Swiss-Prot record:
Entry domain remark: The PPC domain mediates interactions between AHL proteins.
Location in the cell: Nucleus
Function summary: Transcription factor that specifically binds AT-rich DNA sequences related to the nuclear matrix attachment regions (MARs). Acts redundantly with AHL22, AHL27 and AHL29 in the regulation of flowering and regulation of the hypocotyl elongation.
PANTHER family for the chain: AT-HOOK MOTIF NUCLEAR-LOCALIZED PROTEIN 15 (PTHR31100), AT-HOOK MOTIF NUCLEAR-LOCALIZED PROTEIN 18-RELATED (PTHR31100:SF2)
Residues of the PPC domain: 83-217
Biased composition (Basic residues): 19-30
InterPro entries (UniProt xref): AHL15-29, PPC_dom
Protein keywords: DNA-binding, Flowering, Nucleus, Transcription, Transcription regulation
UniProt lineage: Eukaryota, Viridiplantae, Streptophyta, Embryophyta, Tracheophyta
Annotated protein name in UniProt: AT-hook motif nuclear-localized protein 18
GO-annotated cellular components: nucleus
Domain of life from the UniProt record: Eukaryota
Any GO molecular function: minor groove of adenine-thymine-rich DNA binding
UniProt DNA-binding residue ranges: 59-71
């Protein structure tokens, strides 16, 4: 091979190699253009792609936010009492006033029932009816040991109102009973009482309810008897007193037979 051919051969090979490299680069460029990625932005896309930790931080939290429905609610404060509410009273009855009359007037004017819980103080000139039926009039000054009773406004009958008192005399004697006359205070008398506005007067016993209760008791007794009869019919072994293999071949009557009169429930 001469020198001329030697000098041209590497140029020929190098030109083919350059042509192939240029063709391959063109294909890669077209492929990137079809995918919508420009060759100059490849490094930027890789640089801006979020890592795993950043992706977790940017992820939107799921579920209800803390404290969204757990806010403390304002307390409900009732500033107005109901008309039928149960109220407590501390009543002070001045000297020389009738304790029983004062309580009756309070119940009538306020249209509320009054339940006397206790009281203390001193009274004079007391008339009481003792448990034996006798009426005793006491003169002098007595200390109140116990005071109880109730007063209802009209239209309740007067028999629904009254006081019961137990007194201690100057010599230590204790006398008590239902007050049937004036109970005059000889010193300020303090009474603890409760009032209510929804009292209703009823006469007992209630005859209609008694009849209803009797009917309910009779229906319950009949239901118990029917249930017992069904249990006897279902349990044929206990009715006949024979083994179950013999009962299958025996025809039982439609109803249980009572040898004697059926007991009443």
């Amino acid at each position: 091979m001469d020198e001329v051919s030697r000098s041209h051969t590497p140029q020929f090979l190098s030109s083919d190699h350059q042509h192939y490299h240029h063709q391959n680069a063109g294909r890669q460029k077209r492929g990137r253009e079809e995918e919508g990625v420009e060759p100059n932005n490849i490094g930027e896309d890789l640089a801006t792609f979020p890592s795993g930790e950043e992706n977790i931080k940017k992820r939107r939290p799921r579920g209800r936010p803390a404290g969204s429905k757990n806010k403390p609610k304002a307390p409900i404060i009732v500033t107005r009492d109901s008309a039928n509410a149960f109220r407590c009273h501390v009543m002070e009855i001045t000297n020389a006033c009738d304790v029983m009359e004062s309580l009756a007037v309070f119940a009538r004017r306020r249209q509320r029932g009054v339940c006397v819980l206790t009281g203390n103080g001193a009274v004079t000139n007391v008339t009481v009816r003792q448990p034996g039926g006798g009426v005793v009039s006491l003169h002098g000054r007595f200390e109140i040991l116990s005071l109880s009773g109730s007063f209802l406004p009209p239209p309740a009958p007067p028999a629904a109102s009254g006081l019961k008192v137990y007194l201690a005399g100057g010599q230590g004697q204790v006398i008590g009973g239902s007050v049937v006359g004036p109970l005059t205070a000889s010193s300020p008398v303090v009474v603890m009482a409760a009032s209510f506005g929804n009292a209703s007067y009823e006469r007992l016993p209630l005859e209609e309810e008694e009849e209803t209760e009797r009917e309910i008791d009779g229906n319950a007794a009949r239901a118990i008897g029917t249930q017992t009869q069904k249990q006897l019919m279902q349990d044929a072994t206990s009715f006949i007193g024979s083994p179950s293999n013999l009962i299958n071949s025996v025809s039982l009557p439609g109803e249980a037979y009572w040898g004697t009169q059926r007991p009443s429930f």
